[in-house]
Amino acid sequence: MRVIFIINHDDNDSHLIFASGRDSFGRACQAAAIMRPSPSSAPAPLRQASSELTLQTPGPGLHEFTREASAWVAQQGMDSGLLTVFCRHTSASLCIQENAAREVHGDVLRWLDRMAPENDSYAHDDEGPDDMPAHLKSILTGVSLSIPLIDGRLALGTWQGLYLCEHRRRAHRRHVVLHLLGA
């Protein structure tokens, strides 16, 4: 027989303990005592910080801003947490993508062009033939990212970089919000 006990240490700390056989409750209590955090290991209080990057794009493409985001995160002095990145536009977007083989960027852009071509019949064309496809590409790639912060660094893979995807043909000034929650 398997028995489940919920052991509460205080209002903020509870554990599910699985025990079986004779004296299940006694073993569950022993396990809970081992799992109880010591007062010295109390978690650091959460902090948060936010900033806005302004990125000038020369036109369509993937424009890396990993260095700028990483430098800002380092200035915050947090060891662990979560960075949320948000693009404040509907015709640009964000992605985490290959940072070594640049031909990947061309392949991604050509794929997006096939998914949302300029020569389709869109009702919304007030700002030109590249406007509605830019909105659709933004939907496909998204406007927010979440990146864990571990040991004071963004937990990006070796070949990963943070990119603003510019979907319009002409140069734009784009705004990207950084929000870090951590300790």
PLM regions and their residue ranges:
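Active-site histidine-anchored catalytic micro-motif
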Residues: 18, 25, 29-183
